[in-house]
Structures are given as structure tokens and as C-alpha cells.
A protein has these predicted regions:
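Conserved short loop/turn motifs at secondary-structure junctions
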Residues: 1, 30-35
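Alpha-helical scaffold elements that line and support the substrate/ligand-binding pocket
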Residues: 1-12, 45-48, 124
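Short, charged, amphipathic alpha-helices and their helix-cap/turn boundaries
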Residues: 5-25
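N-terminal pre-first-transmembrane soluble regions of secretory-pathway and organelle membrane proteins
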Residues: 6, 13, 29-30, 42, ...
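Domain-terminus/edge residues, biased toward the C-terminal soluble/receptor-binding domains
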Residues: 21, 25, 36-208
């Protein structure tokens, strides 16, 4: 892809910086090198996880699979084996959809967990857990706290928009449509019940 592993690692570090991962530095492609120059933080892992599921949401289709029978085909024939997900939250935490477990002797047991409830998707990132059970327990605690503080307000009743008048156009006016439904997530534990709606536009009444 990049010609050499080092060139690819350089791209990785550039991309990490673009995502705001200020406390991350890669030294290889696999992430298994036990070096003081190879580091990251739970916050940065959460940023990377968010980018992944935002740009490629289909990854959750695969990371949410608990167990799957795989057929390995070679020239000598085929064999079957069962692949089991290492993310135990898939079976124990409601709404869990992934995402990635990992461990090394330095990083200990790590997890980036993704869960969705009531239209809200949260990410819990855990690092340096002493054992697998602790990483899953801590991730569940973080997710529970997040869901207890977050409430989704979704406005389905969109008011009709007035057409936009045109100047020197092929038509006198064109219809306007909403880019999408209005969504707001309260993160302080309160429910956004009393919401006042106001339509605002950043363009003139007459478009050129």
C-alpha cells in the first residue's frame, strides 16, 4: 500500500494526528511491538473507534457476531472450525455491537466497546486491566454511566419550508428540504421535554 512498513506507519501517525489523537504514536503496523515509543490512550482509542464506525458502520455487522462456523478451503481440501468472539460483552451487555479486544504484556487487557440503546451509540475504552473480566466489567460500568446521562431528543414533526426565490434563474423558485431529522442528545441527565423550535436560514430570501 505504502511501499514499505515504515512508510505505512508514517501514514498511520499522520492519520492519528488528523483525528486528534495527540497522545498516540505507532512504530509498527500490527501494534504488538513492546516499545516505549509505541503508545496510545483510552481517549485516543475512542476517537479512532468513533471514526471507524462512523465511516464504515458495516464493521459492526461483523464485530457483533458471537460465534461463526468457518470453512477453510485449500488445494488439499477443506476443513471447518468454529470462531468465537473474544468480546464477552456481546452476550452479557444489552445492545453491545463490538468492537475490539486486545492485550500485550505491557498494555495488559484492553477493550474498545460499542453499545447502542434507544438510538444512542456509546463507546467505552478500557486499557491496562489486570485480567479479562476486569476490562469487561469496567467497560460495562462506563457504558451504564453514559446511558444514564444521555437522552435523545428526535424531532420527527418537521415544519414545511417555504420555497426559495431565485434571481435570474430558470425557475422563479425552488423547493427546500431538510438535510435530515433534528437530533439532540442531552448529556447532563436531564430530559429535553420543553423544546422550542425556531427556523433559521443562513442564506438570503433571494438566491442568485
Amino acid at each position: 500500500v505504502a511501499g514499505t512498513e515504515q512508510a505505512f506507519v508514517d501514514r498511520m501517525n499522520e492519520r492519528a494526528n488528523d483525528l486528534g489523537m495527540k497522545n498516540t504514536h505507532f512504530v509498527d503496523c500490527c501494534g504488538l511491538t513492546e516499545s516505549q515509543e509505541h503508545y496510545t490512550t483510552p481517549y485516543d482509542i475512542a476517537l479512532m473507534s468513533r471514526e471507524l464506525i462512523s465511516r464504515y458502520p458495516e464493521v459492526l455487522t461483523y464485530s457483533s457476531v458471537w460465534m461463526e462456523d468457518i470453512t477453510h478451503v485449500t488445494r488439499k481440501g477443506s476443513s471447518k472450525f468454529t470462531l468465537t468472539n473474544t468480546n464477552k460483552l456481546l452476550r452479557s451487555y444489552e445492545g453491545c455491537m463490538g468492537l475490539k479486544t486486545g492485550s500485550t504484556s505491557i498494555a495488559k487487557y484492553c477493550l474498545s466497546a460499542v453499545a447502542e440503546r434507544n438510538g444512542i451509540t456509546l463507546i467505552a475504552s478500557v486499557m491496562a486491566a489486570p485480567d479479562p473480566k476486569t476490562r469487561f466489567r469496567d467497560a460495562a460500568v462506563l457504558l451504564n454511566y453514559g446511558f444514564s446521562k444521555c437522552t435523545l431528543y428526535l424531532d420527527d414533526a418537521l415544519e414545511p419550508l417555504k420555497p426559495m426565490k431565485l434571481r435570474k434563474g430558470f425557475k422563479e423558485q425552488v423547493p427546500l428540504v431538510y438535510r435530515g431529522k433534528f437530533r439532540y442528545i442531552s448529556t447532563d441527565g436531564t430530559k429535553p421535554d420543553n423544546v422550542k423550535k425556531k427556523l433559521c436560514s443562513d442564506v438570503n430570501d433571494i438566491a442568485h
